[in-house]
Amino acid sequence: MNYDNYWDEDKPELNITPLVDVMLVLLAILMVTTPTLTYKEEIALPSGSKTARATQDKVIEIRMDKDAKIYIDSQTYEYNSFPDTFNLLSKKYDKDTRVSIRADKRLTYDKVIYLLKTIKEAGFLKVSLITSP
């Protein structure tokens, strides 16, 4: 009788299917119970005033049409004389004031850059270009 072959054929095999089933059930229980766990922290929040509102910053809106005419509020300015005029006008505003530029799409690139350069030379750093959707 050959005992070596007998032991080789009868080796026990590890069945992991029940182990996987148990782990999946534990995972499902963990996923269901985790959102219900809440931690209660006592936080004393400062009280705010209901009447105080955030002040909206002043914005200078500069518009330039296809003929290179520049508009600020209801005033019209010429393209060539705009840097000098804007330097005088900018003294009324704080240099942290936001400046928005709305330029016609038919303008050439250099005219818009000229406008940006003029605004930067006046000391304004918060400049944005407005586009239409």
UniProtKB/Swiss-Prot annotation:
It comes from the Bacteria. The chain crosses the membrane at residues 16-32. It is found in: Cell inner membrane. One of its GO terms (biological process) is protein transport. Residues 1-15 are cytoplasmic. Signal peptide: none annotated. One of its GO terms (molecular function) is transmembrane transporter activity. GO terms for cellular component: plasma membrane. InterPro entries: ExbD. Belongs to the ExbD/TolR family. PANTHER family: BIOPOLYMER TRANSPORT PROTEIN EXBD, EXBD MEMBRANE COMPONENT OF PMF-DRIVEN MACROMOLECULE IMPORT SYSTEM. This is Putative biopolymer transport protein ExbD-like 1. The lineage of its organism: Bacteria, Pseudomonadati, Campylobacterota, Epsilonproteobacteria, Campylobacterales.
